[in-house]
């Protein structure tokens, strides 16, 4: 009986851990595929942290004032495999980011592609399944 109870408790614990991990990586939990964005601005900061990287860019608003957007990207390891280096996004670099805005309407988004001022384009490492179909 005790072994059976231990097995059930372990199974429930494993199920809860799996559900948490899945929810963490669910695009639809945070971002809206019906809110595609294109924002152009200057890099303020690039955080190469796990499990996701963050690019902070200043985008000029309609009133001419800078608004900081936080763009989520793949893990540093994935970005390096896609052609990024630690020197790819120094502060001041002008970029265009395509992605999807947060469901709460904040200036936060998941990025799909970055285009540099010279026309070079890099993929931010999130699959089509994560960022919406056909985007």
Protein language model features and the residues they cover:
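Conserved hydrophobic positions within beta-strands
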Residues: 39-43
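OB-fold/S1-family single-stranded nucleic acid-binding modules
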Residues: 102-126
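Bacterial N-terminal signal peptides that target proteins for export
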Residues: 1-9
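Short nucleic-acid-contacting surface segments enriched for D/E, G, S/T with interspersed K/R
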Residues: 80-97
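Short, structured beta-strand/loop micro-motifs enriched in basic residues and often containing a Trp
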Residues: 72-81
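Bacterial N-terminal signal peptides
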Residues: 8-18
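Short aromatic-glycine-enriched beta-strand elements
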Residues: 49-60
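Sec/Tat signal peptide C-region and signal peptidase I cleavage site
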Residues: 19-23
């Amino acid at each position: 009986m005790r072994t059976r109870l231990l097995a059930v408790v372990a199974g429930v614990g494993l199920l809860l851990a799996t559900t948490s991990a899945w929810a963490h990586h669910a695009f639809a939990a945070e971002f809206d595929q019906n809110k595609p964005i294109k924002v152009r601005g200057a890099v303020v900061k690039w955080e190469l942290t796990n499990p996701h990287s963050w690019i902070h860019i200043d985008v000029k608003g309609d009133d001419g004032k800078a608004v900081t957007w936080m763009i989520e990207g793949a893990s540093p390891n994935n970005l390096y495999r896609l052609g990024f280096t630690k020197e790819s996004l120094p502060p001041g670099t002008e970029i265009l980011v395509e992605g999807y805005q947060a469901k709460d309407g904040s200036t936060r988004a998941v990025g799909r592609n970055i285009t540099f001022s010279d026309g070079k384009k890099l993929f931010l490492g999130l699959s089509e399944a994560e960022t919406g179909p056909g985007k």
